[in-house]
Amino acid sequence: MTKYEIFDYDVWGNEEDGYSVNDVIPTGIIIYTDTSKSSICKKLGLDDPYKIDVYVNEDVIYIDYDYKPYCELRKID
């Protein structure tokens, strides 16, 4: 498992017009997870791994929940 900090999103928009991330806020919350949807869902306290979309690059995991930007996990070395 890899160590990440959770960064919260300030999201603007709506389902009809689409969403955009207005600001990214560090939470100071550290979690350990792998990149599987079920693990990320459990660590973030979300109820349905089928509503989650995960986009992974080398240092950041971007998470959408129910088609809306939710948060990102930034890798800590």
Regions found by a protein language model. Give the residues of each.
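Compositionally biased, low-structure terminal segments
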Residues: 5-8, 33, 56, 68
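Local beta-strand/beta-hairpin segments that build beta-sheet-rich folds
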Residues: 22-31, 70, 76
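Short, mixed-charge low-complexity intrinsically disordered segments
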Residues: 42-77
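Short aromatic-glycine-(Arg/Gly/Cys) micro-motifs in beta-strand/loop hairpins
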Residues: 1-26
